[in-house]
A protein has these predicted regions:
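PLP-dependent class I/II
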Residues: 1-301
Length: 301
C-alpha cells in the first residue's frame, strides 16, 4: 500500500497527455533527461519541446530489457533532471524484477534525479507475477512520481482517464502548467473512474487472463516457426527479434505485410536499440493468432 495526501494526486487526460506536459513543466532548455531506448515516443515529447537534451539508456536482452543504471555515465547522471522508467514496459514487454526499483531509487538519491514512472500497464502482468507501485518501495515517494491509467485495465482507452501521484512539488508544477491549458476532467468521467476503481475488479483479471492466452498463442507459435524466444511478460504487446539475423525492421515489416498480410510495428520506431525487433499487439483472439502464425510460416519470410 502507498499512503498519499491530496497534494500528491492529480487527474490527467490520459498518461500520454500527462507525460508530455510534465516534461514541459519540469524542463528548461539544455537540461538532460534520461529516457529508455526503446521507449514509447511520448516519453521524449515534452522534454524535447522544452529544449532539453535526451540521453537514451539502452534496454537490451542481456539485461532482460530492464533499466541498468550502472551503465549510465556518472557525468551524464550528475546533469540529469529526471529519468523516465516504464514497467511493465511498452514496447519491450518487460516487468519489474526483485530489487530493480530499489536500485533505481538508490541511483536517484545519489544523483538527485527525479524518477517518472509510467505504470499504465500495472494490471497486465502474466504468469502469476505481480505489479504494484514503484512508490511502495522505501524512499521512492521522495524521489518520484507515477502515472496510472484506466485505459488498459478497464478497456476505456478513448475516455482518457489517468492520474499522477507522488512528490507534491512535481504535482504542483504540472498542476500550474495545466491550469493555463484546461479546466480539469469532465465530472461524469471522474465519477465513472471512481466507480470502476471501487467496484468489482474481476473484469480486470479476466482481461489479463484473456491477454495471457493471446500471448501464449503468439509466443508459442513464433517459437514453433523458428523465432527466438519473444519477450512478453506484461503489457498487451510482445517484443520479438526478427529471425534470420535481419536488422532492418522497417523493411521486414513491409515485406511481412505484403507477403503474409500481417501488420506489426518496426522496432526502430521506438528508438535505435529497437532495430532488429518488431512489436506485436495482442488484439486478436487465439484462433486468429494461430492463423497469423500460419500466414507468416507460409510466406517463407
Amino acid at each position: 500500500d502507498v499512503e498519499l495526501t491530496p497534494d500528491m494526486v492529480m487527474t490527467v487526460y490520459g498518461s500520454q497527455e500527462g507525460m508530455g506536459h510534465l516534461g514541459m513543466a519540469l524542463c528548461d532548455e539544455g537540461d538532460v533527461v534520461l529516457l529508455p531506448d526503446p521507449c514509447y515516443p511520448v516519453f521524449a515529447a515534452g522534454s524535447l519541446m522544452a529544449g532539453a537534451k535526451p540521453y537514451y539508456y539502452p534496454l537490451v536482452a542481456e539485461h532482460d530489457f530492464l533499466p541498468y543504471v550502472k551503465d549510465i555515465p556518472e557525468e551524464v547522471a550528475r546533469k540529469a533532471r529526471y529519468m523516465v522508467v516504464s514497467l511493465p514496459s511498452n514496447p519491450v514487454g518487460s516487468i519489474a524484477t526483485p530489487g530493480i526499483y530499489e536500485e533505481i531509487v538508490e541511483f536517484a538519491r545519489k544523483y538527485d534525479i527525479l524518477i517518472i514512472h509510467d505504470n499504465a500497464y500495472s494490471d497486465i502482468i502474466y504468469d502469476g507475477a505481480h505489479g504494484g507501485s514503484f512508490l511502495a518501495v522505501p524512499g521512492a515517494r521522495e524521489v518520484g512520481v507515477e502515472f496510472f491509467s484506466l485505459s488498459k485495465s478497464f478497456n476505456v482507452t478513448g475516455a482518457r482517464i489517468s492520474f499522477l501521484v507522488g512528490r507534491p512539488d512535481v504535482i504542483a508544477a504540472l498542476r500550474k502548467l495545466r491550469s493555463q491549458i484546461d479546466f480539469g476532467m469532465f465530472l461524469p468521467i471522474q465519477k465513472a473512474a471512481i466507480a470502476a476503481l471501487n467496484g468489482p475488479l474481476e473484469s480486470v483479471q479476466e482481461q489479463c487472463n484473456m491477454n495471457q492466452e493471446r500471448r501464449d498463442a503468439l509466443c508459442n507459435g513464433l517459437r514453433e516457426i523458428g523465432w527466438d524466444l519473444p519477450n512478453g511478460k506484461g503489457t498487451m504487446f510482445v517484443w520479438a527479434r526478427i529471425p534470420g539475423g535481419r536488422t532492418d525492421s522497417m523493411a521486414f515489416c513491409m515485406e511481412l505485410m505484403e507477403k503474409a498480410g500481417v501488420i506489426v510495428t518496426p522496432g526502430a520506431s521506438f528508438g535505435p536499440h529497437g532495430e532488429g525487433y518488431v512489436r506485436f499487439a495482442l488484439v486478436l483472439p487465439p484462433d486468429k493468432i494461430r492463423e497469423v502464425i500460419d500466414a507468416i510460416r507460409r510466406s517463407g519470410i
